[in-house]
């Protein structure tokens, strides 16, 4: 017998809790639909950004995904090994690399994009078009505010004192 649901009333008013719960559900939807293509969320995002924007500096991709440079390098290494992207050294700045889609990466970006266009429908069936648009707008506002004003963590201060 399945246990009754835990009482989460003390968390239910927190935007972060609600957003995390929704994100978990949407990741399940992503895995169910896009998972068979053996794509991770970050890889899907990179493919779509490259398909929509053309070649992009590796640093800009890391910034767009709020990903540390070493983690982006590992992700791009994996994508390169699968034949989806190529990194080309910039002629202007030899320290910089531009990331390009290969033909295989372009096809995969299109296929995954087509799947993504409709995969959220069942999960969002309880929302009207206007509610969906409002949800996206509000989430973007939260993300933009965070990007504009990155709050200092109390851990940052503790690390400085410990050093």
Predicted regions and their residues:
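Helix-turn-helix DNA-binding motif, specifically the short coil turn and the N-cap/start of the second
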Residues: 68-71
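Short, locally clustered residues in the helix-turn-helix/winged-helix DNA-binding domain
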Residues: 20, 48-52, 113, 140
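Short capping segments at the starts of secondary-structure elements
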Residues: 53-57
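Charged, amphipathic alpha-helical coiled-coil/dimerization segments
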Residues: 27, 77-144
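N-terminal leader segment of winged-helix/HTH proteins
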Residues: 1-37, 153-158, 163
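Pre-recognition alpha-helix immediately N-terminal to the DNA-recognition helix
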Residues: 18, 25, 29, 45-48, ...
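The alpha-helix within a helix-turn-helix
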Residues: 62
């Amino acid at each position: 017998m399945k246990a009754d649901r835990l009482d989460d009333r003390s968390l239910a008013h927190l935007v972060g809790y609600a957003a995390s719960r929704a994100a978990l559900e949407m990741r399940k939807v992503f895995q169910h639909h896009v998972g068979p293509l053996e794509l991770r969320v970050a890889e899907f995002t990179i493919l779509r950004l490259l398909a929509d924007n053309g070649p992009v500096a590796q640093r800009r991709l890391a910034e767009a995904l709020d990903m540390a440079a070493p983690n982006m390098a590992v992700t791009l290494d994996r994508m390169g090994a699968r034949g989806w992207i190529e990194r080309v050294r910039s002629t202007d700045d030899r320290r910089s690399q531009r990331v390009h889609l290969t033909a295989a990466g372009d096809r995969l970006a299109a296929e995954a994009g087509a799947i993504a266009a409709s995969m959220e429908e069942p999960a969002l069936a309880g929302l009207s078009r206007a509610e969906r648009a409002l949800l996206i707008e509000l989430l973007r506002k939260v993300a933009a505010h965070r990007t504009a004003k990155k709050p200092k963590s109390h851990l940052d201060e503790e690390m400085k004192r410990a050093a």
